[in-house]
Structures are given as C-alpha cells and as structure tokens.
Amino acid sequence: MTNQEIREIFREIADLLELKGENPYKIRAYRTVVRSFEEFAVPVSELHAQNRLNEIPGAGEAIKAKIAEMVTTGHLKYYEKLRAEFPEGIRELLAVSGIGPKTAHALYSDMDIKSLAELEEVINSDKPLPRMGEKTRENIRRALAERKKG
C-alpha cells in the first residue's frame, strides 16, 4: 500500500470520525498524520519492513498499528467498519469540493440528503440550506457541475 493510499484512508477516517462526533483530539491525530504523509518521501512499506514506523511524525501507537495492518494486509478493518456505519451517499457528499464533514453532516442530518442527486436537486432549488449562505450554495453548484464534466 502506498503512502498516498494510506494518507487518503486516514483523511477519510478523520472526516467520518468528525461526522460521528468523535473526540476532537482523535480526529486531530489522524489529520496530523495525513499532513505528515503529504511531505513524507520514504515509502511507509520500507519503514515498516525496517521497524521504523516511529519516524512518522505525529503517529502514536494506535495509528502505527493501523499503518502496519494496511502495509501487511492491504486493508484496514477499523476503516471498513467505520465506513459501514455511514451510507455511501454521505461519503459521496464528502468527495464534493467545498463540502467538509460539518457541511455533509448538516446536509445529511438536517435535510436528509443521502446522494449527489438529492444534493443537486436541493442546490438547484430555492430551499434554504442549513447554516449555509448563497456563496456556499454557488460553490457546491459549481463543484457538482465540474464533477459531471468528469
């Protein structure tokens, strides 16, 4: 598993934990490791093979164990279990530029939006969006249009 793949998994874990309302320190730990991986040039598989995971800035014991699991098995049970707690649609919302965990949570919990199609319908209507202004609506509208273009 590449550094980029691990980074993306940890980024999604942090987002899902935020949606879930988890401990902010736990979320911050994952985001710190994500930032570390953005600048880390050494392949994590190499570090694992040499028992040097402690060189990853910000990685505590729990995160190092998760990295080891990903490197050795190619997947992470914790991640799979966490993903299963949320419908696919909410994860799709997180993939839209301009929609972070707080916005996705508001759309999902306040407006029961569970898919990109439902989001697009609401964005293009006159329905008020919870805790969002017209600028956010326009940014999301643009991001959805760009996603359609491919």
Language model: regions and residue ranges:
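Double-stranded DNA-binding cores of transcription factors and transposases
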Residues: 3-39
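Accessory alpha-helical DNA-binding modules that contact the DNA backbone or grooves
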Residues: 29-150
